[in-house]
Amino acid sequence: MSLSALESTINSAFDARDGVSTTTKGEIRDAVESALELLDKGEARVAERGTDGTWSVNQWLKKAVLLSFRLNDMSVIPGGPGQASWWDKVPSKFEGWGENRFREAGFRAVPGAIVRRSAFIAKNVVLMPSFVNLGAYVDEATMVDTWSTVGSCAQIGKRVHISGGVGIGGVLEPLQAGPVIIEDDCFIGARSEVAEGVVVRKGAVLAMGVFLGASTKVIDRETGETFVGEVPEYAVVVPGALPGKPMKNGQIGPSTACAVIVKRVDERTRSKTSINELLRD
């Protein structure tokens, strides 16, 4: 089935999703399974970057993921610690894999790394004990460090370092919401959170503990420019706070969190300078 035929079938099935269930067979099930296989192999992805730098979302692939929850019944997933099992609708990406399959895939998956089927992991990725949700895309030579989460449909670029305990938000619903996107060569500091469709542009550095959502203000302290929903290329960002506004009693109100661009670097400087040096003020 061609991509256009897959898209048409999935869009029609999603419009009539109340009639889709675990007993549904035939064209709809085949189309959803084909779409998930394309995602799993990296032959299709939920979001794609255009030549002008804008990202477009393939909503039909998100619909395929959502339809899979209606099509698939709960089942026992063995292999837990202490001979325990899990109970879910989504199998592991690694189900049935042996040495040859892992060698062909070309990435490392440390014990404790969990990847759900339909997530794509590119060559030379290192997965420490972490969680990668369905529909996500993790590109070449990226590190996903311990206890980090890559949410559903999130798009992670090449040579990205996702430090320990980072949360990269996922999105399936609402359909119009875009996924979190971390472009190539970014560094996401430990315990940071990037959610609600924020785009972190190429080469940006987030210090430890930066929290970014769709409404978080990212302020360039040199120019005063404010960004919302996006971190510019090669920006070095630290946690910050905006001063509180006066309350009715005349006292200064509580401050609100923001993120602060403390400097910007070019590609050459970014490639030759350690992260610690960049974050020194």
Swiss-Prot record:
This protein's pathway reads: Amino-acid biosynthesis; L-lysine biosynthesis via DAP pathway; LL-2,6-diaminopimelate from (S)-tetrahydrodipicolinate (succinylase route): step 1/3
Q: Name one Pfam family in it.
A: Hexapep_2
Q: List the GO biological process terms.
A: diaminopimelate biosynthetic process; lysine biosynthetic process via diaminopimelate
- Broad class of the protein's primary localization: cytoplasm
Q: State where substrate binds.
A: R108, D145
- EC number(s) on file: 2.3.1.117
Instruction: Please state what class of enzyme this protein is.
Output: transferase
Family matches, as InterPro entries: DapD_Trfase_Hexpep_rpt_fam (IPR005664), Hexapep (IPR001451), THP_succinylTrfase_dom1 (IPR023180), THP_succinylTrfase_N_sf (IPR037133), Trimer_LpxA-like_sf (IPR011004)
Q: Where in the cell is it found?
A: Cytoplasm
Under CDD domains, the record lists: LbH_THP_succinylT (cd03350)
Superkingdom assignment:
Bacteria
| GO MF, one annotated term | nucleotidyltransferase activity
Keywords for this entry? Acyltransferase, Amino-acid biosynthesis, Cytoplasm, Diaminopimelate biosynthesis, Lysine biosynthesis, Repeat, Transferase
Q: Which reaction does it catalyse?
A: (S)-2,3,4,5-tetrahydrodipicolinate + succinyl-CoA + H2O = (S)-2-succinylamino-6-oxoheptanedioate + CoA
One GO cellular component, as annotated = cytoplasm
Q: Which Gene3D superfamilies match?
A: Hexapeptide repeat proteins (2.160.10.10), Tetrahydrodipicolinate-N-succinyltransferase, N-terminal domain (1.10.166.10)
SUPFAM superfamilies of this UniProt entry?
Trimeric LpxA-like enzymes
Its assembly, as annotated, is: Homotrimer.
As for family, the record states:
Belongs to the transferase hexapeptide repeat family.
Q: What is this protein called?
A: 2,3,4,5-tetrahydropyridine-2,6-dicarboxylate N-succinyltransferase
Organism for this UniProt entry: Bradyrhizobium sp. (strain BTAi1 / ATCC BAA-1182)
The gene for this chain is: dapD
